[in-house]
């Protein structure tokens, strides 16, 4: 083959590569948010998104931008975050998992990979999100895993917290549990699961909804803790919900106890469903 013919073949292959429809890939992501200024890429501060995109771009050998199921705030963690991206790069699954993990810092990891249909969207295809909030309920603060839970030294009655929270189930106006700076067009959300359980010195508040307004879980937890320690009656949560006034509710619980543990999608996408966690917690 002459040099001219060889060059033409290489050029034709490059053109064909560029004209090929891009692949859409979904990833499951786990991260410890303690050292990051939230999920979203920002200028001059560390973010989970920026670290992930840098690692993916290196493996793909092209710029990669990801879209996520839900943006988490500074200090918030994830065991069940889902993202998607499009790429012209053809790689084995091991490259998108182990290869990307080799280029990520130790506190971010890819848990699974799946090629998805072109109509999949990590955010808009999701039908529900699930969060767990971890409280270390002991007189003395923890030293181990202190950035992965919130310490509360007054004894908490989980039965009171559980009963008080049941009024939040269903579709409601969550203005009383919505951050003032929330940009959502509506405060209405549909909560279909809320459980409060104790595991020794650890308390878990487990909430699932179609979506959440800004700081909704942390604001609910802050008010439930007021009920749990006896500062407020069980009926107070229902009163707050009806009042639609954020200034009447409890303080926002700290970020370090919060985990995005799962995102639900229609069965037709057949996404992997790993254990939610965090740590010792079963599904």
UniProtKB/Swiss-Prot annotation:
Alphabetically list the UniProt keywords.
Isomerase, tRNA processing
Parts forming coiled coils: none
Q: Which GO terms describe its biological process?
A: tRNA pseudouridine synthesis
Catalytic site: 73 (nucleophile)
Q: Write out the residues that bind substrate.
A: 131
Q: Where is this region: Interaction with tRNA?
A: 181-185
Q: Which Pfam family would be a valid example here? A: PseudoU_synth_1
Reaction(s) catalysed by this chain's protein: uridine(38/39/40) in tRNA = pseudouridine(38/39/40) in tRNA
Q: Carries keyword Isomerase?
A: yes
Write down the top EC class of this protein.
isomerase
EC number(s) per entry: 5.4.99.12
The molecular function terms of the Gene Ontology recorded here are:
RNA binding; tRNA pseudouridine(38-40) synthase activity
- The protein's site described by Interaction with tRNA is found at 71, 91, 123, 139, 152
Q: Where is this region: RNA binding?
A: 120-124
Output the HAMAP family linked to this UniProt entry.
Answer: TruA (MF_00171)
Q: What does this protein do?
A: Formation of pseudouridine at positions 38, 39 and 40 in the anticodon stem and loop of transfer RNAs.
Say which family it is in.
Belongs to the tRNA pseudouridine synthase TruA family.
SUBUNIT field: Homodimer.
NCBIfam families named in the record: hisT_truA (TIGR00071)
The entry's protein name is: tRNA pseudouridine synthase A
* Organism this protein belongs to: Pectobacterium atrosepticum (strain SCRI 1043 / ATCC BAA-672)
Organism phylogeny: Bacteria, Pseudomonadati, Pseudomonadota, Gammaproteobacteria, Enterobacterales
**What gene is behind this protein?**
truA
């Amino acid at each position: 083959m002459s040099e001219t013919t060889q060059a033409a073949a290489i050029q034709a292959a490059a053109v064909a590569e560029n004209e090929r429809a891009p692949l859409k890939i979904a990833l499951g992501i786990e991260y410890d948010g303690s050292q990051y200024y939230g999920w979203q890429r920002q200028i001059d501060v560390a973010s989970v998104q920026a670290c992930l995109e840098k690692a993916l771009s290196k493996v793909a050998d092209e710029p990669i931008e990801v879209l996520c199921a839900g943006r988490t705030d500074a200090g918030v963690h994830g065991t069940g975050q889902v993202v998607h991206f499009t790429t012209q790069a053809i790689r084995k699954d091991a490259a998108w998992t182990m290869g990307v993990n080799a280029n990520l810092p130790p506190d971010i990891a890819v848990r699974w990979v799946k090629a998805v249909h072109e109509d999949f969207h990590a955010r808009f295809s999701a039908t529900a999100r699930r969060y767990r909030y971890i409280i270390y309920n002991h007189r003395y603060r923890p030293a181990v895993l202190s950035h992965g839970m919130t310490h509360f030294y007054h004894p908490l009655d989980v039965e009171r917290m559980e009963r008080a929270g049941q009024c939040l189930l269903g579709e409601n106006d969550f203005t009383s549990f919505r951050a003032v700076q929330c940009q959502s067009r509506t405060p209405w959300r549909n909560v279909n699961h809320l459980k409060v359980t104790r595991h020794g010195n650890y308390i878990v508040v487990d909430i699932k909804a179609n979506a959440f307004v800004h700081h909704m879980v942390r604001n609910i937890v802050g008010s439930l803790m007021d009920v749990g320690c006896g500062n407020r009656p069980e009926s107070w949560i229902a009163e707050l919900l009806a009042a639609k006034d954020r200034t009447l509710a409890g303080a926002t619980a700290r970020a370090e106890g919060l985990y995005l543990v799962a995102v639900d999608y229609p069965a037709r996408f057949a996404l992997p469903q790993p254990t939610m966690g965090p740590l010792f917690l079963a599904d």
